[in-house]
């Protein structure tokens, strides 16, 4: 059976050479370099490689698993063998998610180029596949897996094995009936189009057909008016529904005849429901839709802790790959932990542990290269400086020489700021967060203008003078430990110790900011009143995990977002609920790494209190009703027994202010991970919707132990689209797992209005 990918690319010379196979060295370290035989499968979608010595298949991976290919010595592993192998022989395969990169050395430059160009073409082809191509590819993939003897046809025994692989528990009688219906040639086997018929019969969506027929008079098509009715009544769209209907028909209806009639067939209807426009995530929020001209302190900023670590904090690997991955995920604040290194070169690692070490200048070079690949909004380097003055000077030189004019070395207008600059004003810029000698005013010739206001009261003058004297004492003390050159690189993010909210109001300036541990932040969250929220309306604050988290685990970031903390730093290398929430929040606004805080968190006189939101700004309760209808083609649980089939349940979790934290789940469906049906409605009341995140989780029920994770999807409540929606599930590490999805109906009503049944 020919895959759409191989059919499209079968004449490509590079791919033909890749299908013939090539011996290459797989490299893990300077001392671990082993010969492997790599080959592109006939489907043009799978690479397998084996040991040249034994001939046993060692591993396979899909082209869809690959994010990009890097040419030359672009990984630390390949840099370590640069003297042994020329760059034109080397390349790195980078995978989606947290999977380790694959570093390879070809035997000739021509062979390396063949694989680099071939892989790039395959990645581009897969990326540009439409839904029909993807469906054809999935069908082909299943056929390849089930056709054990590789004779190009499938007998009934192979079909039965396939059903188990697909998480389908079906009676032998029903399976044989579907098999016979598809076996048009009556040969006792399925091949080519016969298998396509079988797959389509297997994947028929009865629940979608029912919705279609509810709105279709003849049961065969939706006229334009019928489709408009569906958009208004089913999808709860209120504006421009006729224009939307025309656009959706033009884009998703496969039949030219139906298009000319401005009608939609059941095939087009299903394609639309599975498209981005049929997704639960509002496509308008995939664009840059927020005001980016507010001061930095008015945004939640995607922030990473111990960015250089790939694993735990005791023996884990330090790598520039940590920075590359974080920045490519939209992270805008990365941590650089510096220590004195040999040969006068500062190094980055988790100090006083067995983690490996990397050069500071290599980290800055990686940041320079990748800072603005996915977002052109500012990157903040959070500097944890343990170096002596001499190597601090070296750090300053590297920052200036490598980053050039990207590094902010003065206020934007050369004047003392009266507010923090906006993300828009700082496009393409890199800010250094760290300690600074004295005040910013000392390094600027321009003095404050009248807009800052004059201090006329005699008592205030005395207080200011005393404060200046204290500043001079502190500056003199810090000069002994801090390089002037490095200090001059700190402009808008001067690090100062946090004492109390009252102390910050009395002594600190808007360009000064504090970093506190999650433990201290939680204590501040528990303080009565809303001082924390007000503080974060005018000054930046960074929260980071406690040092006790040696396994690089994370804390719940929602608690910090509830009080407006901008930089809630997490260990990006560690998958889990906490990173799901982070990915969910920053999924919106073009994934640019900046999300505008709600208006009630952006002014210092706000009354909003997350612990007691009733009667304050931000309190606008709504009812959320979720009808969980079905799931489609759920993946097998990791490390599950052969032949086992999942018993799926769906849990919906609400994260937000304390009163909104809750979860509900459906019953489990026994032995059906392929097309389970629930038709269960879950009801929630959300009091502060602008801070709420909704997480959909699918688990494999286990009555004797903990349920196993199957997939999840997290998004801001305000980004949810009402109506019939698909939720395209993600794996534990946040990568896509097509075609796995949930199908739901969403209804949101004002909490003062009675809910309607779906």
UniProtKB/Swiss-Prot annotation:
Ranges for domain PI-PLC X-box come to 290-435
Signal sequence, renumbered to the chain: none
PI-PLC Y-box domain residues: 486-602
Cofactor remark from the record: Binds 5 Ca(2+) ions per subunit. Two of the Ca(2+) ions are bound to the C2 domain.
- Name of a matching Pfam family: PI-PLC-X
Q: What GO CC terms are in its UniProt record?
A: endoplasmic reticulum; nucleus; plasma membrane
Among its keywords, does the record have Metal-binding?
yes
> Where in or outside the cell?
Membrane; Nucleus; Cytoplasm; Endoplasmic reticulum
Q: Name one GO molecular function term.
A: calcium ion binding
UniProt-annotated binding residues for Ca(2+) 3:
306, 335, 337, 384
Major localization class: membrane
Catalytically driven reaction(s): a 1,2-diacyl-sn-glycero-3-phospho-(1D-myo-inositol-4,5-bisphosphate) + H2O = 1D-myo-inositol 1,4,5-trisphosphate + a 1,2-diacyl-sn-glycerol + H(+); a 1,2-diacyl-sn-glycero-3-phospho-(1D-myo-inositol) + H2O = 1D-myo-inositol 1-phosphate + a 1,2-diacyl-sn-glycerol + H(+)
Question: Which residues does the annotated region (Substrate binding) include?
Answer: 26-53
Please list the residues that bind Ca(2+) 2: 183, 185, 187, 189, 194
- Locate the EF-hand domain: which residues? 134-169, 170-205, 206-237
Domain (PH) ranges: 16-124
Per the entry, what this protein does is: Hydrolyzes the phosphatidylinositol 4,5-bisphosphate (PIP2) to generate 2 second messenger molecules diacylglycerol (DAG) and inositol 1,4,5-trisphosphate (IP3). DAG mediates the activation of protein kinase C (PKC), while IP3 releases Ca(2+) from intracellular stores.
Q: What is known of its domains?
A: The GBA (G-alpha binding and activating) motif mediates binding to the alpha subunits of guanine nucleotide-binding proteins (G proteins).
Protein's recorded name: 1-phosphatidylinositol 4,5-bisphosphate phosphodiesterase delta-4
Species for this entry? Xenopus laevis (African clawed frog)
* Protein's gene: plcd4
């Amino acid at each position: 059976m020919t895959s759409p990918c191989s059919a499209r690319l079968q004449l490509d010379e590079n791919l033909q050479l890749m299908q013939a196979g090539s011996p290459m060295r797989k490299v893990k370290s300077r001392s671990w370099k082993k010969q492997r035989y790599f080959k592109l499968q006939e489907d043009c979608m799978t690479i397998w490689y084996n040991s040249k010595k034994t001939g046993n298949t060692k591993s396979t991976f899909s082209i869809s698993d690959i994010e990009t290919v890097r040419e030359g010595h672009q990984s630390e592993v390949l840099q370590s063998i640069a003297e042994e192998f020329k760059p034109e022989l080397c390349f790195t395969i980078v995978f989606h998610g947290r999977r380790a990169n694959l570093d390879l050395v070809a035997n000739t430059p021509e062979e390396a180029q063949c694989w680099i160009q071939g892989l790039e073409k395959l990645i581009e082809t897969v990326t540009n596949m439409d839904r029909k191509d993807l469906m054809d590819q999935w069908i082909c993939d299943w056929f390849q897996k089930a056709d054990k003897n590789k004779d190009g046809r499938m007998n009934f025994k192979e079909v039965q094995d396939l059903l188990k692989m697909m998480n389908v528990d079906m009676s032998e009688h029903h399976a044989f009936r579907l098999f016979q219906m598809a076996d048009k040639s009556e040969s006792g086997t399925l091949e080519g189009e016969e298998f396509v018929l079988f797959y389509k019969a297997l994947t028929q969506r009865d629940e979608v057909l029912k919705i279609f027929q509810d709105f279709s008079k003849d049961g065969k098509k939706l006229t334009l008016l019928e489709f408009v009715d569906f958009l208004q009544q089913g999808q709860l769209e209120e504006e421009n529904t006729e224009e939307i209907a025309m656009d959706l028909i033009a884009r998703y209806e496969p039949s030219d005849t139906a298009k000319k009639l401005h009608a939609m067939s059941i095939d087009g209807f299903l394609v639309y429901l599975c498209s981005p426009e049929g997704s639960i995530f509002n496509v308008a929020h995939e664009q840059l839709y927020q005001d980016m001209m507010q001061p930095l302190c008015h945004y939640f900023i995607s922030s990473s802790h111990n960015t250089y670590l790939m694993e735990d904090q005791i023996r884990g690997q330090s790598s520039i790959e940590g920075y590359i991955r974080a920045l490519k995920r939209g992270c805008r604040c990365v941590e650089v932990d510096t220590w004195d290194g040999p040969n006068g070169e500062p190094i980055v690692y988790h100090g006083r542990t067995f983690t490996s070490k990397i050069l500071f200048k290599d980290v800055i070079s990686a940041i320079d290269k990748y800072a603005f690949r996915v977002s052109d909004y500012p990157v903040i380097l959070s500097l944890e400086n343990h170096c002596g003055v001499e190597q601090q000077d070296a750090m300053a030189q590297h920052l200036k020489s490598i980053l050039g004019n990207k590094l902010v070395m003065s206020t934007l207008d050369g004047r003392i700021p009266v507010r923090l600059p906006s993300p828009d004003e700082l496009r393409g810029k890199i800010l250094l967060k760290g300690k600074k000698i004295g005040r910013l005013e000392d390094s600027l010739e321009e003095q404050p203008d009248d807009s800052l206001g004059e201090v006329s009261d005699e008592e205030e003058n005395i207080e200011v003078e005393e404060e200046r004297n204290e500043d001079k004492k502190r500056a003199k003390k810090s000069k002994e430990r801090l390089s002037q050159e490095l200090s001059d690189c700190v402009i808008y993010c001067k690090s100062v110790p946090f004492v109390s909210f009252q102390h910050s109001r009395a002594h600190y300036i808007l360009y000064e900011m504090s970093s506190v541990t999650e433990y201290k932040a939680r204590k501040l969250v528990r303080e009565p009143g809303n001082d924390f929220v007000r503080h974060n309306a005018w000054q930046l604050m960074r929260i980071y995990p406690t040092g006790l988290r040696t396994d690089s685990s994370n804390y719940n970031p929602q608690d910090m977002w509830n009080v407006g903390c901008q930089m809630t730093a997490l260990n990006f290398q560690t998958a889990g609920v906490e990173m799901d929430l982070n990915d969910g929040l920053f999924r919106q606004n073009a994934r640019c790494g900046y999300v505008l805080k709600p208006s009630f968190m952006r002014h210092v006189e706000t009354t909003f209190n997350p612990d007691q939101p009733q009667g304050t700004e931000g309190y606008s309760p709504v009812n959320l009703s979720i009808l969980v209808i079905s799931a489609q083609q759920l993946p097998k649980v990791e490390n599950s027994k052969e032949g086992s089939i999942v018993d799926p349940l769906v849990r919906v979790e609400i994260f937000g202010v304390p009163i909104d934290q809750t979860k509900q789940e459906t019953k489990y469906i026994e032995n059906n991970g392929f097309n389970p049906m629930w038709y269960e409605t879950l009801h929630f009341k959300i009091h502060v919707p602008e801070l709420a995140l909704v997480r959909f989780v699918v688990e494999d029920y286990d009555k004797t132990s903990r349920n196993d994770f199957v997939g999840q999807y997290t998004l801001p409540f305000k980004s949810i689209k009402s109506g019939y929606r698909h939720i395209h599930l993600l794996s534990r590490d946040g990568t896509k797992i097509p075609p796995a999805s949930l199908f739901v109906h969403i209804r949101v009503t004002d909490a003062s209005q009675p809910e309607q049944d779906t």
